[in-house]
Amino acid sequence: MLIDVAFTPSEVQAIDSKVCVVIDVIRATSSLTVILSKKPDKVILTTTIMKTNKIASQLTVHPLLCGERKGLPPEGFDFGNSPAEYFKADLLGKTVIFTSSNGTRAIADVTVAANVYLGCFLNGSAVAKKAYDYAVAHEKDILFVCAGREEKFAIDDAYCAGYLVSRVVSLISSDTEFRLGDGAQAALGIFGYYRDDKRLLEMSGAGKNVIDIGLSEDLTFLLQRDLIEVVPELITDNNPNPEYGFSVFL
């Protein structure tokens, strides 16, 4: 088993035989983990506002439009991209359409993977176990895919990737052969180097943006480890009914 990290979606190659865990810790995968814990009826991800509005116009039920551009909810949206806000929201039985600047694009880029999960600090142990168990059962490799920021490296995602790699490694039995790719080793190094996780996130580009728009409480919230045992999972033809499933409108 190969465990590796891609620090941007552009690094991803030949993923049809891999289990992919997408990370956009500030804040899309954190928000989506919370959203799915609230047991909505459907969660649909899109890459553009135009696609969001198109899907909404085609549905017979009134969906909740959720997400952000430049950190804030676009005009006419019901919610933004705040995991702390979603934690207090009543989403039971609702249809949610979600779009974000970086996270949903990264997720869309890996839909051909053997299986796709969403990871963050909030569900770290749960997503690590889910990915590891699937990889062992189906003889697949594990690739953590960082969304990055504006198609570039993001230290917050890399740090979270290192944390998730460490959680997977802790699960590996002594009789399981595995190796860490260069990206996974680098992510572990980043995770081990920084001791003040909140300070790291505050100094990151995405973190500074969240602070600038007045949502610094999101950083405190999303750093809570293992708050939620929900693992968002892509709905596919081979995986039509995951417990916490989402679909992607390409």
Q: Where are the regions that the model predicts?
A:
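Structural motif
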Residues: I3-D4, K18-V21, D41-I44, H62-L65, ...
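Residues that scaffold, gate, or flank divalent-cation-dependent active/transport sites
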Residues: D4-E11, A28-P40, M50-V96, T104
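Solvent-exposed alpha-helices and their adjacent loops that cap or buttress functional pockets
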Residues: E11-I15, L36, A56-Q58, F87-L91, ...
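Long, charged alpha-helical interface segments
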Residues: D78-R105, D109-N115, K129, I155-L250
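Short, structured patches in soluble enzyme cores that scaffold and shape functional sites
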Residues: S100-N102, C120-F121, F144-G148
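Catalytic cores of nucleophile-dependent amide-cleaving enzymes
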Residues: C120-A135, E139, R149
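Phosphate/ribose-phosphate-bearing ligand recognition and processing surfaces
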Residues: A147-D157
